[in-house]
């Protein structure tokens, strides 16, 4: 089970976008995540007529390491650490360590 999943709201804890909040768009296998409108770079792209892509300079989201993001706790209004626990029915769920609230209902 992963600490950060697709669709989670996260806060960036390090780097040029420190303190910004966004939603995880994609989780990569090498412990990196792509966060919406975070770590934007300008990419020079050639036109590709077969795929219908125009050329030019485009803004693109680049992945950041999972250690540089924290899951956003809406009850506290800030980032929080995540742990795992097993419920009585045998399900393994994520929870916020500061207030023991379950993330996955």
UniProtKB/Swiss-Prot annotation:
It holds the Pfam family KOW. One of its GO terms (cellular component) is ribosome. Keywords: Ribonucleoprotein, Ribosomal protein, RNA-binding, rRNA-binding. The lineage of its organism: Bacteria, Pseudomonadati, Pseudomonadota, Gammaproteobacteria, Chromatiales. The keyword Ribonucleoprotein applies. One of its GO terms (molecular function) is structural constituent of ribosome. One of two assembly initiator proteins, it binds directly to the 5'-end of the 23S rRNA, where it nucleates assembly of the 50S subunit. One of the proteins that surrounds the polypeptide exit tunnel on the outside of the subunit. The keyword rRNA-binding applies. This is Large ribosomal subunit protein uL24. SMART domains: KOW. NCBIfam families: rplX_bact. It comes from the Bacteria. Belongs to the universal ribosomal protein uL24 family. It comes from Thioalkalivibrio sulfidiphilus (strain HL-EbGR7).
């Amino acid at each position: 089970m992963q600490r950060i999943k697709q669709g989670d709201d996260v806060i960036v804890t390090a780097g040029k976008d420190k303190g910004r909040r966004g939603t995880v768009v994609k989780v990569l296998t090498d412990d990196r995540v792509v966060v919406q409108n975070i770590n934007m770079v300008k990419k020079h792209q050639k036109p590709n007529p077969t795929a219908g892509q125009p050329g030019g300079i485009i803004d693109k989201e680049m992945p950041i390491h999972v250690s540089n993001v924290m899951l956003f706790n809406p009850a506290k209004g800030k980032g929080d650490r995540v742990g795992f626990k097993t419920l009585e029915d045998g399900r393994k769920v994520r929870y916020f360590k500061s207030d023991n609230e379950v993330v996955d209902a």
